[in-house]
C-alpha cells in the first residue's frame, strides 16, 4: 500500500506547450576575417505579446545550456525641470550663476539690477 505522502499531485506547468518555441543556433559572419560565430535570432508577434516590444531593454542571463531573457521595465521619464537642471549642470560656473539669478528674479526674491 502506498503512503499518503508518496502520491503524486497533479500540477499545472508554468509554461504551456502552446507557448514553446523552437529555434536552431545558426551563425553570423564576423568582419574582417568572416569567421562564423554562433547566433540565435528571435522574431515574431509573440515577442511583443510576451512583453518584448521594439526598443525594450533586455537582461540576458547565461548558464550552461540555458539562456534566460527578461524584459526590463521602462525607465520613468524625467520631468522637464529635471532635464533642464541636468543641462544647467553642464554649463560654466558663470552661466550657472546667471541661471540662479534669473530663478531668484522669477521667484521674486531678487530685484532686477
Curated annotation (Swiss-Prot):
UniProt KW Transport keyword: no
GO CC annotations on file: bacterial nucleoid; cytoplasm
Biological-process GO terms, alphabetical: bacterial nucleoid packaging; DNA damage response; nucleoid organization; RNA metabolic process; SOS response
GO molecular function: DNA binding; identical protein binding; RNA binding; RNA endonuclease activity
Description of what induces expression: Repressed by LexA, induced by DNA damage. During the SOS response (at protein level when expressed as a fusion protein). The mRNA stability and translation is controlled by the small regulatory RNA symR, which probably blocks ribosome binding. Expression of the proteinaceous toxin (putative endonuclease) is controlled by antisense sRNA SymR.
This enzyme's EC code(s): 3.1.-.-
Top-level taxon: Bacteria
Keywords on record: Cytoplasm, DNA-binding, Endonuclease, Hydrolase, Nuclease, RNA-binding, Toxin-antitoxin system
InterPro entries, per database record: SpoVT-AbrB_dom (IPR007159), Toxin_SymE-like (IPR014944), TypeI_TA_SymE (IPR020883)
Subcellular locations according to the entry: Cytoplasm
Enzyme category, top tier: hydrolase
PROSITE patterns per the UniProt record, alphabetical: SPOVT_ABRB
Domain SpoVT-AbrB: 29-74
Similarity section: Belongs to the SymE family.
Record function comment: Toxic component of a type I toxin-antitoxin (TA) system. Involved in the degradation and recycling of damaged RNA. It is itself a target for degradation by the ATP-dependent protease Lon.
Note from the entry: Overexpression of this protein is toxic for the cell, affecting colony-forming ability and protein synthesis.
UniProt protein name: Toxic protein SymE
Species this protein is from: Escherichia coli (strain K12)
Gene encoding the protein: symE
Amino acid at each position: 500500500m502506498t503512503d499518503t505522502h508518496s502520491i503524486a499531485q497533479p500540477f499545472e506547468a508554468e509554461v504551456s506547450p502552446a507557448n514553446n518555441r523552437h529555434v536552431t543556433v545558426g551563425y553570423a559572419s564576423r568582419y574582417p576575417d568572416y569567421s562564423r560565430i554562433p547566433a540565435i535570432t528571435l522574431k515574431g508577434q509573440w515577442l511583443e505579446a510576451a512583453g518584448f516590444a521594439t526598443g525594450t531593454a533586455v537582461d540576458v542571463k547565461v548558464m550552461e545550456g540555458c539562456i534566460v531573457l527578461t524584459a526590463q521595465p521602462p525607465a520613468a521619464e524625467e520631468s522637464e525641470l529635471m532635464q533642464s537642471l541636468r543641462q544647467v549642470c553642464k554649463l560654466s560656473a558663470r552661466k550657472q550663476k546667471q541661471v540662479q539669478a534669473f530663478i531668484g528674479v522669477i521667484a521674486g526674491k531678487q530685484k532686477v539690477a
